[in-house]
Design a protein with these regions (language model features):
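Short amphipathic alpha-helical segments and helix-helix/interface helices
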Residues: 110-111, 134, 160-161, 184-185, ...
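Membrane-anchoring hydrophobic helices of lipid-metabolizing enzymes
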Residues: 2-124, 157, 161, 168
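Catalytic core of membrane glycerolipid acyltransferases/transacylases, capturing the structured
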Residues: 71-72, 76-79, 118-176, 190, ...
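Hydrophobic alpha-helical transmembrane segments
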Residues: 21, 67, 135-138, 217
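Non-catalytic C-terminal accessory region of glycerolipid acyltransferases
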Residues: 2, 50, 114-115, 139, ...
Length: 297
């Protein structure tokens, strides 16, 4: 059963022991952000050397999917790892009380859905820094439920729950017995917001094939199936880093033909999401954080 809940190529777990993470939070309270970024810039080359699988996957992404030459691909891999490190540092910065600027495009879409009694689904992906959206896209009327990986350290989970709870948000952990599905369905039945990632296949999870960067890629069916079965609206949210303390959030509708068969609706939602994801990744290519061959899932 555990195999169904862990990606075969990429665990998605934040690196570092709990004491290291607690120390990082403490350092954020006394050190400027630019200094920690500088240390990260020096660490990145070593991480690239020892994380060969992740390096290769990102190099192939820039070279094969975006058409970069060899030198440009290499530099982009470094920029990608550095940007990923920055987003992790920013997350711990929030835990330590650091403030960031957020600009949101499409906030009115969320505001409008919150006026209606039914719940809705927010789809995220492993680009930019979606978790930090939980500290900016604050629901005004509805409770927000985020489905998250259960394998993080206690330090990460405690701080995540603490910060989110301040904004009428709660965490639903992925469970081996799949009980999280009941929690998600219950939240939608109660007219609440459900948020989950829609870009990674875990083990034997059912998937849907989509056209993505001029090739076929598999996306998990679960989020789209839930939205269709519950007949609720779907939004995609991408939160991209644009400066040292500045993020830009894109909130977009994910549409399908509600008169089509349920299977066709799921496929249309998945393709609509994949199209929007590709658009954002092309705008921010160094913020694509799936460190495995996405097209060979």
């Amino acid at each position: 059963m555990a195999d169904t809940l862990q990606h075969n190529e990429w665990s998605g777990k934040t690196d570092g022991q709990p004491w290291m993470q607690r120390s990082l939070i403490a350092m954020f309270r006394v050190l400027p952000l630019w200094l920690l970024y500088g240390v990260m810039a020096l660490v990145v080359p070593f991480y690239m050397i020892f994380n060969k699988k992740g390096y290769r996957a990102m190099y192939d992404f820039f070279h094969d999917r975006l058409g970069y030459d060899e030198w440009q691909s290499f530099l982009s891999v470094y920029a990608n790892h550095f940007k990923f490190g920055q987003t992790i540092l920013d997350r711990f910065g929030v835990y330590a009380g650091k403030k960031y600027q957020f600009f949101t495009e499409g906030q009115e879409l969320m505001d409008e859905l919150e006026k209606h009694p039914e719940g809705f689904v927010l789809l995220s992906s492993h680009v930019g820094n979606y978790e930090i959206a939980g500290y900016s896209l604050k629901p005004k009327r509805k409770k927000f439920n985020a489905l998250v990986f259960a394998g993080e350290t206690a330090t990460v989970m405690e701080n995540r729950k603490r910060v989110l709870s301040q904004n009428n948000m709660s965490v639903i952990l992925v469970q081996e017995d799949l009980s999280h599905l009941f929690a998600l369905n219950s939240a939608l039945d109660n007219g609440e917001i459900v948020s989950m990632a829609a870009d990674r296949i875990f083990g034997s999870q059912k998937s849907v094939e989509c056209h993505f960067f001029d090739a076929k890629a598999n996306f998990p069916l679960g989020a789209f199936a839930m939205a269709v079965q519950k007949n609720v609206p779907v939004l995609a949210v991408f939160v991209m880093k644009e400066g040292m303390k500045r993020y830009y959030a894109y909130v977009e509708e994910v549409m399908c033909d509600r008169h089509a068969s349920k299977r066709e609706q799921m496929e249309q939602l998945a393709q609509s999401f994949a199209k929007r994801l590709e658009t954002v990744v092309r705008l921010y290519p160094t913020q694509w954080f799936n460190y495995y061959d996405f097209w060979k899932q």
